[in-house]
Design a protein with these regions (language model features):
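Cofactor-pocket helix-loop regions in the catalytic cores of large enzyme subunits
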Residues: 1-71
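Glycine-rich, acidic loop regions that bind phosphate or pyrophosphate groups
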Residues: 2-9, 14, 121-181
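Short, ordered loop/turn segments at secondary-structure junctions
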Residues: 42-44, 73-76, 147-149
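Glycine-rich, anion-gripping cofactor-binding loops and their flanking helix/strand elements
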Residues: 49-66, 70-135, 154-157
Length: 181
């Protein structure tokens, strides 16, 4: 488990993501959040092992955490295939820009988000989005759910093998289901 950026050419600066060594950290953050949001990208339908995909975990996390969901690219169709109706479609860069806007009141008009979980977005795109949020929305906490370390997130898993990553996601889901989000 290494906390080194997967993308070597970029330098994240002096402030790097804290490493998620215990999935309970993610569960506690979601529980404490007033307005959590989950952003899911197109790799969610491919990332995983066997019949377990990130999209399946995204549905479970969204339901258990009682959070809004933004699906980027064609991902909204994947949510519909899973029977999840609560996903809103928006381009990845658009949701990033809106989250940086202090005047934006959220997808439902109920106010700003205080926690954003991100997964399934191409590594280099997620890198740029998280960098923008780190610098232009500093009060927003971010969590990368992907298996490669994202230094611009507030919290990120280290570089993990697929099997270990899925175990961590299983623990996040079971923790959220136990605590009721």
């Amino acid at each position: 488990m290494r906390a080194e950026p997967w993308q070597k050419a970029e330098v994240p600066g002096p402030l790097k993501a804290s490493v998620i060594t215990k999935p309970e950290v993610v569960v506690a953050m979601v529980r404490r959040a007033r307005r959590p949001l989950l952003i899911v990208g197109p790799e969610a339908s491919q990332a995983g092992l066997g019949d377990r995909r990130l999209i399946d975990y995204a549905v479970l996390i969204a339901k258990a955490g009682k959070m809004g969901v933004v699906a980027t690219a064609q991902t909204v169709g994947e949510f519909l295939k899973k029977g999840f109706q609560g996903a809103v479609w928006m381009p990845a860069m658009d949701i990033a820009n809106r989250l940086c806007d202090p005047g934006w009141k959220g997808l439902d008009g109920a106010g700003r988000y205080d926690l954003v979980l991100v997964g399934g977005i191409h590594y280099y795109v997620e890198w740029v989005i998280l960098s923008a949020l780190k610098h232009f929305a500093p009060s927003l906490k971010t969590v990368s759910l992907d298996r490669f370390y994202q230094p611009h997130a507030t919290w990120s898993f280290p570089n993990l093998k697929v099997e270990e990553w899925l175990k961590q996601l299983d623990l996040v889901v079971s923790g959220l289901e136990k605590t009721g989000g």
